[in-house]
Amino acid sequence: MTAEAPPLGELEAIRPYPARTGPKGSLVYKLITTTDHKMIGIMYCVACISFFFIGGLLALLMRTELAAPGLQFLSNEQFNQLFTMHGTIMLLFYATPIVFGFANLVLPLQIGAPDVAFPRLNAFSFWLFVFGATIGAAGFITPGGAADFGWTAYTPLTDAIHSPGAGGDLWIMGLIVAGLGTILGAVNMITTVVCMRAPGMTMFRMPIFTWNIMVTSILILIAFPLLTAALFGLAADRHLGAHIYDAANGGVLLWQHLFWFFGHPEVYIIALPFFGIVSEIFPVFSRKPIFGYTTLVYATLSIAALSVAVWAHHMFATGAVLLPFFSFMTYLIAVPTGIKFFNWIGTMWKGQLTFETPMLFSVGFMVTFLLGGLTGVLLASPPLDFHVTDSYFVVAHFHYVLFGTIVFATFAGIYFWFPKMTGRLLDERLGKLHFWLTFIGFHTTFLVQHWLGDEGMPRRYADYLPTDGFQGLNVVSTIGAFILGASMFPFVWNVFKSWRYGEVVTVDDPWGYGNSLEWATSCPPPRHNFTELPRIRSERPAFELHYPHMVERLRAEAHVGRHHDEPAMVTSS
């Protein structure tokens, strides 16, 4: 007998199946007991995207309600619950924890560490977030319904008289528990970055994403304990009659100061990591090193420092804050953000650009975030802010900066690192469909809301009069919202299909031009990430490993410092 080998062209890589499947329930047991940072990162991402879908569903209900005046298929109370829980879920149960999803997936790999510094604390942080978020959202199944005082929880709306019932209490306790998980996660990330970098990985050789996670974690340690303390005070007011936020002693403004001193650093806590994600993606698809690495780091540090000095721009309309100071500081924080834009543009400038899905989402992030940033500069001016505060103009502004940053960069990161985590590539055609539906749906929904706010439509209203003239733009906005909702279908199908049947990745770096260390190990990485580490001589160790013939040229062309092989430049006067 002779055996005939198949032609080489017919052979394709397949993922080998395990010798046998484990006993029933073994996967659940593994998920509950795991301390592997990669597994925990995937669990964070799945949980956060699930909450993102729930928050989006609440938003669709609100947009449907506002499509026409007098519709009232939701009661006013239900509408209040929806906008409260929508804001809470999106900001605190999706945006903040998914930061730790990406940090867990990528950060130990980027610094050449076998795991995070405290693996069990890492798992504990995740479960605190899951249970805290579940407690916070559980108000929907109580007789009085969920919390209905807005995600900012302004007093006296949150006191026992105006918001009786379990929904508000569950909201407060859920945020305390989830916030504790966030604080512990930040402690873990700072320790990991400081103590577990590979030999040769100096601070200024760390990837930008790692820098941003470290700075974000420091901000979390500044902001979140304050929120926890403020929430405990609110619970004491509701149950013990503590009178901390009593209007009679100025407590209403005290709550606003405490909340926004958390709230403004919070928006940078959920922006900086996503700046880091796109800063990892632009160089790879531009075939160039990041432009202005050091400047990017200092811009990140500047944003973090300034973010704790602008909180009262949320309070211009109270008349109780120093307008010139907070206005000036808000203008000032736009400067380092603008510097980042020039870094990203400089990275793409004259690069060999290709527009795979991660790059598309990153460019979508830049366009959307730029528009949101410009309306932010408008709102930094108190005379303008007085006119549009608490209107749909503000709603449009913060959705542009938050959706533009978090959602576009989340999807960019998922498409970028999915092959590293699973060993399979996501489908490019579905990815591009997902991007264009998201981009068109988002801008259709929120661009018109600037004009609605300018015409005087207040936020958080469940209805409006036919004579107000708001219906046309609201219909456009609602249509956009449903397009945005539909954009999630190709994404979910893509992840489900590719997880099981996607093209298998057979190389360490499927994109071909990866810079940081995660592209110097297998897809997916082994349990402790690396079997061997390349030498780290710059901020691009994986690129230098895969393109050793480029190293000398990269050193020669790097416009930093003086080259020792050239004579010193002599200047004559």
UniProtKB/Swiss-Prot annotation:
It is an enzyme of class 7 (translocase). There is a cross-link at H264-Y268 (1'-histidyl-3'-tyrosine (His-Tyr)). It is found in: Cell membrane. It catalyses: 4 Fe(II)-[cytochrome c] + O2 + 8 H(+)(in) = 4 Fe(III)-[cytochrome c] + 2 H2O + 4 H(+)(out). The modification N-acetylthreonine is found at T2. Its EC number is 7.1.1.9. The keyword Secreted does not apply. Cu cation binds at H264, Y268, H313, H314. GO terms for cellular component: plasma membrane. Pathway: Energy metabolism; oxidative phosphorylation. Cytochrome c oxidase is the component of the respiratory chain that catalyzes the reduction of oxygen to water. Subunits 1-3 form the functional core of the enzyme complex. CO I is the catalytic subunit of the enzyme. Electrons originating in cytochrome c are transferred via the copper A center of subunit 2 and heme A of subunit 1 to the bimetallic center formed by heme A3 and copper B. Belongs to the heme-copper respiratory oxidase family. This is Probable cytochrome c oxidase subunit 1. The gene is ctaD.
